[in-house]
Structures are given as C-alpha cells and as structure tokens.
Amino acid sequence: MGEAPAFFVDHLENGYTNGFGVKSEPKNRDTSVLIGDRSFVIGGNHEGNPLFLGVQIHDKVTNKWSSPSVLGTGPKPCKGYSAIVLPKGRILVIKKGSASDDSIWFLEVDTPFIREQKKLLGREVVAWSKGVRGNAEKPIVISGPSGVGKGTLISMLMKEFPSMFGFSVSHTTRAPRCMEKNGVHYHFTDKTVMEKEIKDGKFLEFASVHGNLYGTSIESVEVVTDSGKRCILDIDVQGARSVKASSLDAIFIFVCPPSMKELEDRLRARGTETEEQIQKRLRNADAEIKAGKSSGIFEHKLYNDNLEECYKTLKNLLGINDLAPVNGVEVEGINLPKEHTVTKMDDKILIQETGEGTKNKMIVLDLSSINGGAPGRTRGIVLDTVKSS
Ligand SMILES: Nc1ncnc2c1ncn2[C@@H]1O[C@H](COP(=O)(O)OP(=O)(O)OP(=O)(O)O)[C@@H](O)[C@H]1O
Ligand SMILES: Nc1nc2c(ncn2[C@@H]2O[C@H](COP(=O)(O)O)[C@@H](O)[C@H]2O)c(=O)[nH]1
C-alpha cells in the first residue's frame, strides 16, 4: 500500500490567504510538514508578494515562528498542492492545475547547501527548486601535473559561464599562497582536523600530494550541485581514481603538458613554489602523466600547448560551442492532470488522474532519479506515464 502525501492543501489561490497571510502564527497548522523539530508551513504570499508562495517555520523546541530567507524563485500561488517529505531535508510539492513549467517543486529545508547558507546568513533559510525532466549534467574531474594549466582553464570556464559551472573547493593542509583566499581557493585546514574529518567520513576523496594532504569533502560537491551548477573538481590522479570508484558519476579529463621543459618553465614562471618544491612537483609529474595516459580513468585527454586552443577544445568536449545555448541545461516541463491524487510508494510518487470523462492517466515519478537542484534551479526527474484501465 502506498502512503498518502504529508498533506494536501486546497484553495491557495492568489488573494485567498487561507490563514497564511499573517506575520506571526499561521492559523491553519495542520498544513505544516514536520521535519525534526521544525514544522514548515507553505502557503499564502512570500513577504507580501502575491506572485510567490510563502514559507513559515515553527520551531517546536523554542515554540517560535520565523519567516526564513527564501532562496530561488518559488512557485506561483495555486489552487492546491500535495506535500511529501523526502529524505535528506527536502519537501516535494506537487501543484494542482498548474502550467507544465510550474507543477513540481522541491523545497530544500535541511540540505548541506541550506546548512551552509544558514551559517552565512545567520538565520533560517529555505530554497526552492523547480522540478523538470531529464538528467542533471555530470560533474567534471580535471587532473594533470602541477603547472600544466588546470586552474587557468577552470578559471576561464567559470569566468565565461558563471551561472553554469561551480568549483568544488578542496581542503588542504598546505599553506595559502599570497593571493589565495580561505573558502574560495581552498579550505585551508589543520592536519589533525582534516585527519579527524576524513575519519568521520566527510570526504569523497583525499590524497597526499607533493607532501601535503588534499581532499574533496562531500559537502563541497553538494554545495555546488545544490546550487544548480555543474561541479568542477581540480584534483590529482590518486583523487580521480577514488572518485571513479565512488558513487559520483563524473566525466574525467586529463590535461597533458606539451613537454616536461614547458611544464618546468610554467611552474617557475608562476613563482609560487620554492626550488625544492618545484623539483618535487616535477618528479611527481612523470608518474602522474604516465598514470593519466594509461590508467583507464580518463576518457578525455587535453594537450595544453596553446591556451586558447586548449580552452576551445575543452568547451567543445563539454558540449559548449558557438552554436549551442550556454545558459544552463535545456529544460522540459511536466504536464500533470488538472485533477489528481498523489500517493507515495517507496521511492516512487504516483500521480493518478481523477474526475469524470478523463483517461485515468497515471504518472509515475521516480524519486531515485532526483539530483542536482536549488535555488531556483532544476534537477533531473524521470517520469513514466501509464494508462490505467
Ligand atoms: N597554455 C599555456 N601556455 C603558457 N602558460 C600557461 C598555459 N596554461 C597555463 N599557463 C601558465 O602556467 C602556470 C601554471 O598554470 P596553473 O596554475 O593553471 O596550473 P595548475 O595545473 O593549476 O597547477 P597546480 O596543479 O599546481 O595547481 C600559470 O602561471 C599559468 O598562467
Ligand atoms: N586528490 C586531490 N588533489 C587535489 C585536491 N585539490 C587539489 N588537488 C591537487 O593538488 C595538486 C597541487 O595543488 P596546488 O594548489 O598545491 O598547486 C594539484 O595537482 C591539484 O589538482 C583535492 O581535493 N584532492
């Protein structure tokens, strides 16, 4: 047997406040979704704006109501909706009688992205993301010897397409270079702290590289994917091997130098390492290049000789060229029957058409396919339409 949705709310059209127009305690409390110690009440207007659905939070422990910062563009007010609590701090909202580009939404209330935003903003935060069909783009792992130009290529990509790509900020125990900012280039971390976090299972991968510890925390990747951007990881070959073995379905690119002499020249010209460190990095480069070319980890190899040409090849490889649109992934809306019931069955949501003279269409939404997301962004949904008799 399936479970009924957490709740169904009727008549939430614009102008029909249904008890949610109030600043403090909403009157209609049975329409709240309980997650941990907090109830999330979805309805009425967002900060008096009649175009967007509002959210309020009740904390059971403090018995206080708050209006969170709402990230992303949320759904328009609607006739009614079903709300279903999903794992990992998300609420699925399925609207009634809405346009195909406004029918399925996710409210993030306790994801890593939300927790990070809460820390930053110092207040309650939630984020909306719209549900669309299709799969989110795979993260990109870029490896190559030190000084080959990985960081340069990634910076060019992020500068040209800031809304499309996001950088996974690694942790490292090495000291910051003079222009490097904590939390932007790396999370500069004490070795004992990082070792403890590795032990606590917080890292997707880690490795000792040129005498220091480097690692990608699960949260660093989630922060990017939850912001709806395609995640880029700049990691060494050992790290790439670990990611390949993990559940992260990524594409792997290895950047080769035109020659060892050119690699050495670039490292020296960068001027960020001591002579001893340069020698160490060059020694390691040999083994890295061999592993990169022969390990079977990398499906794509780039030669960074001429920077502009290499960048163009990288863009082509990522499906970005002068003819293709670059403002995010092309999205497909979801047409739902005007009148329907919603049932949850394991990781499937069944949306059954109701009403006289209808075709009794059933839409099956596969929750296991959901990834990426928020705020205001899309995530992949796989839908099947079944005709019941
Ligand atoms: N095609 C190129 N031609 C000449 N110089 C380049 C080219 N690509 C990058 N560089 C320069 O080489 C130096 C090293 O590049 P970058 O810092 O991007 O390397 P990296 O692979 O990220 O190194 P690391 O792994 O140590 O972080 C930089 O000074 C950069 O400006
Ligand atoms: N396995 C990992 N390797 C990483 C990570 N972050 C960076 N790196 C690699 O380290 C070297 C040196 O970087 P530098 O900033 O000190 O020059 C470079 O090859 C990076 O790709 C990581 O999280 N995991």
From Swiss-Prot:
One of its GO terms (biological process) is regulation of developmental growth. The active site is at R177, R270, R281. Its EC number is 2.7.4.8. Disruption phenotype: Growth retardation, narrow and dark-green leaves with elongated petioles, root growth inhibition and reduced fertility. The double mutant atgk1 and atgk2 is lethal. The keyword Manganese does not apply. Residues 137-319 form the Guanylate kinase-like domain. It holds the Pfam family Guanylate_kin. The gene is GK-2. Monomer. It comes from Arabidopsis thaliana. The lineage of its organism: Eukaryota, Viridiplantae, Streptophyta, Embryophyta, Tracheophyta. Essential for recycling GMP and indirectly, cGMP. Required for normal development of the gametophyte and embryo, in association with GK1. Disulfide bonds: none annotated. Keywords: ATP-binding, Kinase, Nucleotide-binding, Transferase. It catalyses: GMP + ATP = GDP + ADP. This is Guanylate kinase 2. ATP binds at G144, P145, S146, G147, V148, G149, K150, G151, N304, D305. It is an enzyme of class 2 (transferase). One of its GO terms (molecular function) is guanylate kinase activity. Belongs to the guanylate kinase family.
